[in-house]
Curated annotation (Swiss-Prot):
Binding-site positions, Zn(2+): 123, 154, 259, 263
Regulation: Hydrolysis of both phloretin and MAPG is competitively inhibited by DAPG.
Organism of origin: Mycobacteroides abscessus (strain ATCC 19977 / DSM 44196 / CCUG 20993 / CIP 104536 / JCM 13569 / NCTC 13031 / TMC 1543 / L948)
GO molecular function terms attached to this record: metal ion binding; phloretin hydrolase activity
Consequence the record notes for mutating residue 115 to A: Abolishes activity towards phloretin
Name the UniProt record assigns to this protein: Phloretin hydrolase
Outcome (variant: residue 154 to A): Abolishes activity towards phloretin
Result when mutating residue 123 to A: 9-fold decrease in activity towards phloretin
Length: 281
């Protein structure tokens, strides 16, 4: 593992604020600003993927993620001809289980301090409109986040983003969810990412946790500014994010790869332990 050594100035302020805010929380001992990524990731950051390595969003393409083995370009980024972007990311979680992943995806969302554990430098705030879901009886882990919207403030690179992520049943996008178990997929977190305020679609996000001999591996895909699908009326005159002057899908895809690799490799360092301490009894 190699440490991340570039921290934009605003994220330097944020990590200090996060460290102070979390001090009196019972899980404060999991706050660790030392973040690192595997050496092989750096090669993926030096040049974009080739067009033939980009996975599409049709049901046929998405279900290639259920096939045994790996696809070309499991970790990488690129811009697309229409100005959109694409990010793929593979992160391994030794000693962890899909049950831990499902628990984390609802547990972290009810306090910003929990959220900051995941990426101390870039995660600023999170809240939900359904706080009662945290303690509601007789819900599965999936039911505590699928169908819910997480309101998030974070940095992707040096850019602060106010976004909303609505988590969905992956079958809605054409995944053969009935085939997940046979493919070794034990958990998922798929969602639509919208810009807060304008409700312009920022990304389509897929996380699939596939069981391995020593834990699980997380295979992620982001299609950035892939289509116009506002949940509410968009800002007048703007139909899609790629039409915004100065928007670069390629740059956003690159920064998303750095962010994803950093946060999920960091989560892998403490997920088994925090689940053991704060997970279900």
């Amino acid at each position: 593992m190699h440490p991340i050594t570039y921290y934009p100035v605003d994220t330097q302020r944020l990590v200090r604020s996060n460290a102070e805010r979390i001090r009196h929380k019972p899980y404060a001992h999991y706050f660790n600003p030392d973040v690192a990524v595997p050496e092989e990731v750096f090669a993926a950051l030096k040049a974009p993927l080739e067009p033939e390595q980009v996975l599409g969003t049709s049901s046929t393409e998405l279900n290639r993620l259920l096939e045994p083995g790996y696809l070309e370009g499991e970790t990488g980024y690129c811009g697309l001809p229409d100005g959109a972007g694409y990010t793929s990311s593979l992160v391994r979680f030794p000693g962890a289980t899909p049950e831990m992943f499902r628990w984390w995806f609802w547990w972290h969302s009810f306090e910003p301090e929990r959220y900051s554990l995941w990426h101390p430098w870039c995660h600023a705030d999170i809240w939900r409109t359904d706080p009662e879901t945290e303690t509601a009886p007789n819900l599965t882990d999936e039911q505590r986040y699928v169908g819910s919207t997480h309101h998030i403030n974070e940095y992707i690179g040096q850019d602060p983003l106010d976004i909303e992520i609505t988590f969905i049943d992956p079958a809605r996008w054409g995944f053969d969810a009935d085939g997940f178990a046979a493919a070794g997929i034990g958990a998922h977190a798929c969602g639509s990412v919208l810009m807060k305020g304008s409700h312009m679609r920022l990304a389509t996000m897929v996380h699939l946790a596939r069981i391995t001999d020593d834990g699980f591996e997380l295979r992620s895909r982001y299609w950035i500014a892939d289509r116009a699908e506002p949940r509410h009326d968009p800002v007048a005159g703007i139909a899609q994010l790629t039409t915004v002057p100065g928007f670069s899908g390629e740059r956003q895809a690159y920064e998303q790869l750095v962010h994803d690799q950093t946060e999920f490799n960091h989560l892998a360092t403490f997920l088994p332990d925090i689940y053991q301490e704060f997970g279900p009894r």
